[in-house]
């Protein structure tokens, strides 16, 4: 390899890493206490691979769950199985964060869910929302942690 090729390869690596770093968003911890894991992504379970990370909630339900970045509530699921009370937030960069096994939603989200449950005459709902319906700010409390759905103890599935 000649010097020019090495120089160009190094230049592209530096520019590429700069672009990646300037586009990376700083995400907030969803809790007001340090994160401890109770489950890892890809961990082998009895009948599946775990598709998220589980955060301990100090052994209790009812801890405030904050949004990690601004965005909008793009999906809400309520079910006695799976995530139980689940919340999906889509962020400006296109990523979606999932919050599962929630005890209850914030008032504005809970009001919307209740309205839809009555309209559909069903406790179980799987709602897909438009960006203008329920926008959220970074650090906003959107729910309380819980143990709903297919959960073996209080935690936040993220």
Residue ranges and their predicted role:
Residues 1-26, 30:
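Bacterial Sec-dependent N-terminal signal peptides
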Residues 22-95, 103-108, 122-125, 132, ...:
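Surface-exposed, glycine-biased beta-strand/turn segments
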Residues 154-158:
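Histidine-centered catalytic micro-motifs
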